[in-house]
From Swiss-Prot:
It comes from Pseudomonas fluorescens (strain Pf0-1). Its EC number is 4.2.1.41. Pfam families: DHDPS. Belongs to the DapA family. Keywords: Lyase. It catalyses: 5-dehydro-4-deoxy-D-glucarate + H(+) = 2,5-dioxopentanoate + CO2 + H2O. It is an enzyme of class 4 (lyase). It comes from the Bacteria. One of its GO terms (molecular function) is 4-hydroxy-tetrahydrodipicolinate synthase activity. One of its GO terms (biological process) is D-glucarate catabolic process. This is Probable 5-dehydro-4-deoxyglucarate dehydratase. Pathway: Carbohydrate acid metabolism; D-glucarate degradation; 2,5-dioxopentanoate from D-glucarate: step 2/2. Signal peptide: none annotated.
Length: 303
């Protein structure tokens, strides 16, 4: 799959990021991960991102990363394209990117670099180096320390033909509008704020109809129903699902930093696809929070 073909795929439909399965000892659970991917693939996501933020990329050892990407690529070879999360320092990100390409990933999501303070010119140089290290398509993720501006993205687009996507995790509407207007159809645009469904209607109005769903990990039918309601501008259905599920869900998620990942793993366990504990420094939901989430999921019915 060439970068332009990937761009076309990412320009429509729902995307998701499977959690990474760990056993009770905290080691990668390959069998559980395969089972998860086989469950999720038929629901109709346009692409799945292995070892992304929700997949706890930041906590993985290099050897685990290779096994996770290979498992995802092999399991989903005939069903859904797999993109791989990459990040860290520039040299680390290049190593991950080249390994993911070697293992057959169709593209990459370039996560924000390590927490070193840097100018955005330096961040752009980091992105350029990673893009030029591979031939597959790359989506850059503007979030936290990565705040690339429209002029910098335009420069990167000229220098890196395989940079085909922009994912927004900042929620800076002025910046998003400037990027969307200036770059036009050069990129595919993905909404990437935590619990992106809450912002989906607003982002669609900005020309960003595609987003990544974390809750697809445990209520995939509801996630797809919500996406289709957004696509057809069924405001009544969108409002009902936000009121009945997403707002109470946010009340739980917002209790602690890092719960955006922890709550998804809890949801997967409730759905019958236990992915094990999160890795430190993240913490799992408390027993009370888990039961609150279970009651909320139960109201969504069979998936």
């Amino acid at each position: 799959m060439n970068p332009q073909e990937l761009k076309s795929i990412l320009s429509a439909g729902l995307l998701s990021f499977p959690v990474t399965d760990f056993n009770a000892q905290g080691d990668f659970n390959r069998a559980g991960y395969i089972k998860r991917l086989e469950w999720l693939a038929p629901y109709g996501a346009s692409a799945l991102f292995a070892a992304g933020g929700t997949g706890e990329f930041f906590s993985l050892a290099a050897s685990e990363y290779s096994e996770i990407i290979k498992t995802a690529v092999d399991t989903c070879a005939s069903s859904v394209p797999i993109l791989a999360g990459v990040g860290g320092s520039t040299r680390q990100a290049i190593e991950y990117a080249q390994e993911a390409e070697r293992l057959g990933a169709k593209g990459l999501l370039l996560l924000p670099h390590y927490l070193t303070e840097a100018s955005q010119d330096g961040v752009a140089a980091h992105v350029e180096a990673v893009c030029k290290s591979v031939n597959i398509g790359v989506v850059v993720y503007n979030r936290n320390v990565c705040r690339l501006t429209a002029p910098l993205l335009e420069r990167l687009a000229e220098r890196c033909p395989n940079l085909i996507g922009y994912k927004d995790g900042l929620g800076d509407i002025e910046l998003m509008v400037s990027i969307r207007r200036r770059l036009g159809d050069r990129f595919s645009y993905l909404g990437g704020l935590p619990t992106a469904e809450v912002y989906a209607a607003a982002y669609k109005a900005l020309g960003v109809p595609v987003y990544s769903s974390a809750v697809f990990n445990f209520i995939p039918k509801t996630a797809m129903d919500f996406y289709h309601a957004i696509a057809r501008e069924d405001h009544a259905t969108v409002g009902k699902i936000i009121d009945d599920f997403f707002l109470p869900y946010l009340d739980i998620r917002n209790r602690k930093a890092g719960y955006a990942v922890s709550i998804v793993k809890a949801g997967a366990k409730i759905a019958g696809y236990d992915a094990g504990p999160v890795r430190a420094p993240l913490t799992d939901l408390t027993g009370e929070e888990y039961e609150m989430l279970a009651a909320l999921i139960d109201k969504q019915g069979a998936q």
